[in-house]
């Protein structure tokens, strides 16, 4: 057994103190996650028990302030899923192609301009995205498609697809820049074109980092509230059309929490628990993708 010895020099004391600080920071991070998890389950489970898991998760009607309240969150769940998937279908290809352009093809001057624009985009507050969407996008959707109102699922998808771009682009560029140049040089030496090399060599080699950026973008989309609340219409409808006014999980909480009480407030905590579980699942999938990518690379 290794004998314990007290630090005897200033450098050793400093090392011991820093190790203790690092350890405490790690414990603090884990503790915060544990406290949040416990609180969410303790706050969210009671209402699910009172309402009934099936009625709560698969009920199609939400009327929390009616004389006979109904607490079905299926419209919220589906709206969040459809909105996130729709934003991903737009944002992921655009973000990935932008990252390839910045990493492999852009001239230095152009790269600096685009990178600066992406960084500025990442710093814009959610409420600004929502305001622009409400003033520009919503009227445009109503006019182009001949609808009475443009506040709908489609508007939310477009806004979210723009909001997730910085996460996808930034992380993907970093991953692509980390690909060893020997991989691309070997491909070019064998007669492959630049485009073939980027899509068949560079992107597969950087897949774990790109996947991380995509999952971060998805997490941003599913957790967004303010911008979505300003453009989606906020009606608890089933999302059976892109032009339907809908409510997401996040906006349901933000819209009613200020005046909720009793079972209604407990139900909102249950919605937060469902959202929390979604985020946890996304993080688990991210770790699985990263571990799988690392094993393949080894």
Roles of regions detected by a PLM:
Residues 171-172, 194-230:
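Transmembrane alpha-helices
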Residues 94-133, 297:
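Cytoplasmic-entry segments and transmembrane alpha-helices of multi-pass inner-membrane transporters
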Residues 228-276:
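Interhelical loop and adjacent transmembrane-helix boundary motif
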Residues 1-26, 286-298:
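Transmembrane alpha-helical segments of polytopic membrane transport and secretion proteins
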Residues 73-101:
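Transmembrane alpha-helix signature in integral membrane proteins
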Residues 173-177, 181, 188, 255-298:
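C-terminal transmembrane helix and the adjacent membrane-cytosol boundary/short C-terminal tail
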Residues 15, 94, 107-112, 180-181, ...:
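Amphipathic cytosolic juxtamembrane alpha-helices at the membrane-cytosol interface
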Residues 119-164:
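Generic hydrophobic transmembrane alpha-helix motif, especially the helices
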């Amino acid at each position: 057994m290794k004998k314990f010895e007290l630090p005897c020099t200033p450098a050793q004391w400093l090392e011991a103190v820093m190790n203790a600080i690092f350890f405490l920071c790690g414990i603090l991070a884990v503790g915060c996650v544990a406290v949040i998890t416990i609180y969410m389950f303790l706050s969210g489970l009671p209402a699910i028990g009172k309402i009934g898991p099936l009625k709560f998760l698969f009920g199609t009607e939400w009327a929390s302030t009616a004389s006979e309240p109904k607490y079905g969150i299926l419209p919220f769940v589906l709206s969040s899923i459809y909105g996130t998937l729709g934003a991903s279908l737009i944002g992921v290809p655009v973000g990935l192609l932008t990252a390839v352009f910045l990493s492999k093809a852009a001239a230095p001057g152009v790269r600096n301009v685009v990178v600066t624009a992406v960084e500025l985009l990442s710093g814009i507050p959610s409420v600004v995205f929502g305001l622009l969407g409400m003033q520009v996008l919503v009227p445009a959707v109503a006019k182009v498609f001949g609808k009475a109102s443009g506040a709908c699922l489609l508007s939310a998808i477009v806004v979210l697809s723009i909001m997730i771009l910085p996460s996808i682009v930034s992380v993907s560029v970093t991953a692509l820049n980390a690909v060893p140049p020997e991989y691309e040089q070997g491909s070019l030496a064998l007669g492959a074109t630049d485009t073939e090399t980027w899509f068949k060599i560079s992107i597969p080699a950087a897949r774990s980092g790109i996947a991380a950026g995509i999952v971060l973008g998805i997490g941003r989309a599913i957790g967004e509230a303010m911008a979505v609340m300003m453009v989606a219409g906020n009606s608890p409808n089933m999302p059976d059309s892109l032009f339907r006014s809908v409510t997401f999980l996040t906006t349901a909480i933000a819209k009613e929490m200020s005046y909720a009480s009793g079972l209604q407030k407990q139900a909102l905590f249950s919605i937060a628990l469902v959202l929390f579980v979604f985020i946890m699942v996304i993080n688990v999938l991210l770790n699985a993708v990263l571990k799988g990518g690392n094993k393949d690379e080894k």
